[in-house]
């Protein structure tokens, strides 16, 4: 099978000899991959890994799978084959994958020496997104979406509405990360928010906050291209290089709706200066959320910045099935706009060219490159497919506008009868 595979730190390469995945458990299905996004985690695995992947010569704790493995965990595709225990999905369905591998998935690998190992405390309590042995399909547990096909259990697959193109469907996983952060902080509609960092997660948080009824969103981002994109997606923007750190915080607090800081802040950058800004830009009793993945190093901040104003600081890790379902529902209802979501995609590349044409580009051109998605199955038809899908979306929008107009006319007629 063709794949862009991880062989170890600094060693990602294309192969056409990766082992073909097969159904083992009765509730598994085979997915023909259409698109799979590149995540910051994939870049860190290349430059600083292994993080979720096992060391070369070792196996993953959950699955006992070794390297090499196909990378990629932001995947969408079409069901190709179903096991005898699959109940709700059928061949031909468009699906997106929740790629977590946790204690509850051990049954899928009956030959693993850990198949009967006791579940960790978090999994026992239902918080599988913070499993002590957390791994990902495409990052350690098993091969992922930078390959032609993936096998996954049905409970990790969600049907995508027919009108959602599969390139946009590949954004559902990162959007679920953002949605989970909003759930974790118990976001209240009508509140205000500051997002620090306009990478894919920061931009996705704009979409999630809009869908959740946020009254005002400000994004702090130094890169011009990313600020422009954040504006297109409905946020006010600020360039933090315009002022020194203290002046930036004072300015951001002043432009919050109300003039005294934000109800919620979301740190999508993961730096000491952004953590402190996330806390200090809050109004009293506000909540700061960390979505960034940090290295294992210590930083300085003042606990009294939290205590004196009864602020809260919390982390958000991955997602659960609730978040995937909520994002898909928001797409169905139009609360997440497909065209706005598609702004996040700045490149489409075949997996053969994935290392130089995508991964290295994201590492070396990160200010102007946001989200690149890979395909194993489109073979040079990237631009044509994207153009066709844009036409489909425009036609869908036109039909919806016509329906709304007809409804308005009918309502007006009823009022005058």
Which sequence ranges carry the predicted segments?
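Glycine-rich beta-strand-centered segment in the early N-terminal region that forms part
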Residues: 21-36, 51-119, 161-163
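Adenosine-nucleotide cofactor-binding segment
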Residues: 192-198, 210-277
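N-terminal Rossmann-fold NAD(P) dinucleotide-binding loop
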Residues: 202-203
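C-terminal hydrophobic helical "lid"/dimerization subdomain
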Residues: 276-280, 321-417
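Glycine-centered, small-residue-biased loops immediately flanking beta-strands
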Residues: 191, 286-287
């Amino acid at each position: 099978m063709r794949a862009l595979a991880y062989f170890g730190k600094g060693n990602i390469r294309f192969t056409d000899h990766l082992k073909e995945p097969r159904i083992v458990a009765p509730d598994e299905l085979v997915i023909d991959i259409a698109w799979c996004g590149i995540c910051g985690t994939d870049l860190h695995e290349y430059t600083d890994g292994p993080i979720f992947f096992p060391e070369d010569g070792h196996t993953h704790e959950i699955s006992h799978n070794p390297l090499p493995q196909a990378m990629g965990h932001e995947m969408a595709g079409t069901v190709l084959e179903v096991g005898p225990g699959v109940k709700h999905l059928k061949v031909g369905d468009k699906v997106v994958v929740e790629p977590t591998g946790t204690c509850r998935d051990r049954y899928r690998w009956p030959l693993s020496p850990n198949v009967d190992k006791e579940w960790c405390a978090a999994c026992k309590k239902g918080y599988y997104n913070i499993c002590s042995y957390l791994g990902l399909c495409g990052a350690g547990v098993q091969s992922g979406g930078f390959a032609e096909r993936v096998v996954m259990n049905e409970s990790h697959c969600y049907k995508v509405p027919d009108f959602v193109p599969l390139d946009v469907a590949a954004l559902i996983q990162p959007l679920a990360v953002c949605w989970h952060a909003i759930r974790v902080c118990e976001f209240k509609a009508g509140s205000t928010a500051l997002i620090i960092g306009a990478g894919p997660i920061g931009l996705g948080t704009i979409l999630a906050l809009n869908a959740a009824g946020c009254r005002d969103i400000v994004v702090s981002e130094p890169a011009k291209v990313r600020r422009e994109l954040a504006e297109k997606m409905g946020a006010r923007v600020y360039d933090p290089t315009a002022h020194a750190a203290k002046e930036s915080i004072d300015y951001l607090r002043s432009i919050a709706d109300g003039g005294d800081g934000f109800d919620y802040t979301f740190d999508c950058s993961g730096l000491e200066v952004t953590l402190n800004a996330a806390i200090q830009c809050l109004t009293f009793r506000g909540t700061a959320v960390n979505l960034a993945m940090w290295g294992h190093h210590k930083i300085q901040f003042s606990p009294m910045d939290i205590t004196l104003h009864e602020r809260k600081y919390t982390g958000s890790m991955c997602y659960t099935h609730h978040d995937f379902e909520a994002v898909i529902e928001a797409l169905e209802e139009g609360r997440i706009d497909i065209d706005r979501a598609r702004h996040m995609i700045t490149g489409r590349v075949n997996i053969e060219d994935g290392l130089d044409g995508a991964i290295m580009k994201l590492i070396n051109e990160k200010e102007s490159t946001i989200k690149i998605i890979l395909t194993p199955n489109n073979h040079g038809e990237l631009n044509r497919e994207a153009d066709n899908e844009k036409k489909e979306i425009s036609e869908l929008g036109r039909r919806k506008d016509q329906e709304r107009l007809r409804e308005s006319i009918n309502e007006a007629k009823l009022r005058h009868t």
